[in-house]
Design a protein with these regions (language model features):
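Short glycine-enriched, charge-decorated loop/helix-capping segments at active-site entrances
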Residues: 32-36, 132-140, 348
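Short, small/polar residue-rich loop motifs at catalytic or cofactor-binding pockets
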Residues: 265-269
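Radical SAM enzyme core and accessory elements
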Residues: 1, 278, 289-292, 322-393
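Radical SAM/AdoMet-radical enzyme domain recognition
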Residues: 47-66, 73-201
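C-terminal accessory region of radical SAM enzymes
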Residues: 210-253, 286-332
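Canonical Radical SAM [4Fe-4S] cluster-binding loop centered on the CxxxCxxC motif
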Residues: 6-42
Length: 393
């Protein structure tokens, strides 16, 4: 139980949901698409809300332009708000955007670069995978648009992450799509299975083989002295190995600080929130278009401020001692489990404390791949890998 004597931090960082609309119709999207757009006035109020809180906390405010597809609001919000922040506010302010990339052109990418706006590109792979997973509303090809955008992103924004979601129908192409990302010039990727979909044992086996292909490629790259395209979850796996060993030595259980509600994403307990087009505050961006103000993830609005009573209520719904999956007792991660994504837990299982079985399976797979890589390259005393290990853990 988290008491009111715990001081909740002011919200200084936000996913600014500019619209619930999108030009794509992705098969797995959590957004309930509708023509609800944020006004520039609301965007300014949200920005000043974050600035005022950041000033009180002596921190740098930050915004991630989010959607739907935020590029639909390029002229209405992104350009004028960015110009105000960079040219009139003129103090440090972190800006980024999560986009499907299909509405980007050279001029816009140059604007993002000049104004130091970070980019996370949501793209699932080559033409076959991208067009199946992420078609246009009319069923047309989104890849045919992106093929001309990708070289511009790589040229102007070389640090952009290639962010993939995989589904059972296309999971046999995961490693091909990782290779596509690398060959296109990306230095890092992120992939996650759609946990809202049913995964058969056969499809899980295929996905596991795809990730082993990546691990083998990773190992061969280090043997050749070449930097592989990076997957941050593998680095997290290296950290988990150290945490698990430390927890075993100390006879501790669930040592990860992420198990504490006041340090966990999605519980309204941090400096982060999502702001919907109407100015409402939510603990997670996945909930802004799903349940409205009746949601347990609703925590106030930018006009009246955060509702700390609602934040405490949400925090106290989460209990790391109860957070569980299908078979925790034999799970390699049971000492350092972070309790999963509370929003996904809630939407799939009905409880913030109950993890989807597919999430657990995926986390165990990633740990197994990290162990496989570590044991192989560690046994070979690969110096390049040793330096990576030291830097990561």
């Amino acid at each position: 139980m988290v008491g009111h004597d715990y001081r909740l931090p002011r919200i200084t960082s936000a996913m600014l949901v500019l619209t619930h609309g999108c030009n794509l119709e992705c098969r797995y999207c959590f957004v309930q698409q509708n023509p609800c757009h944020m006004t520039f006035e609301t965007a300014m109020r949200a920005t000043n809300f974050l600035i005022q809180n950041a000033d009180r906390e002596n921190l740098v405010p930050s915004i991630n332009f989010f959607g739907g597809e935020p590029m639909l609001m390029w002229d209405e919000i992104i350009v004028p708000l960015t110009n105000w922040i960079r040219n009139e506010y003129q103090k440090p302010f972190s800006l980024s955007i999560t986009t499907n990339g299909t509405l980007l052109n050279k001029e816009q990418i140059e604007f993002l670069t000049q104004n130091r706006i970070g980019v996370l590109l949501s793209i699932d792979g080559d033409k076959e995978t991208q067009d199946y997973n992420r078609p246009l509303h009319n069923g047309g090809s989104s890849f045919d648009i992106l093929k001309d955008v990708i070289p511009l992103i790589v040229e102007y924004r070389p640090g952009t992450t290639f962010r993939m979601t995989t589904i059972p129908k296309t999971c046999e192409h995961v490693f091909e799509n990782i290779q596509f990302a690398q060959e296109s010039g990306f230095k890092s990727f992120f992939v996650i299975p759609n946990v809202f979909e049913k995964w058969s044992d056969e499809k899980r086996g295929i996905l596991a083989k795809e990730m082993r292909k990546y691990s083998d490629y990773y190992i061969e790259s280090f043997r050749d002295g070449v930097e592989p395209i990076r997957f941050s979850e593998i680095d997290k796996g290296f950290v988990a190995i150290r945490q698990i060993n430390s927890a075993i030595d100390a006879k501790e259980y669930r040592t990860s600080n992420k198990c504490k509600s006041y340090g966990k994403c999605g519980l309204g307990a941090s400096r982060f929130a999502s702001i919907d087009p109407n100015g409402n505050l939510y603990a997670c961006q996945e909930m802004t278009s799903n349940e409205g103000e009746q949601s347990i993830f609703y925590i106030g609005n930018i006009f009246d401020g955060e509702r700390d009573d609602l934040r405490y209520r949400l925090m106290n719904l989460y209990d790391s001692s109860q957070a569980s999956g299908e078979d925790c007792s034999s799970c390699k991660l049971n000492r350092v489990c972070d309790g999963g994504c509370v929003a996904n837990n809630y939407m799939i299982t009905g409880s913030v404390n109950k993890l989807p079985e597919m999430y657990c399976w995926w986390q165990r797979l990633l740990l197994d791949e990290a162990i496989y890589i570590m044991q192989t390259l560690g046994t070979e005393e690969n110096d390049m890998f040793r330096k990576r290990w030291v830097n990561v853990v």
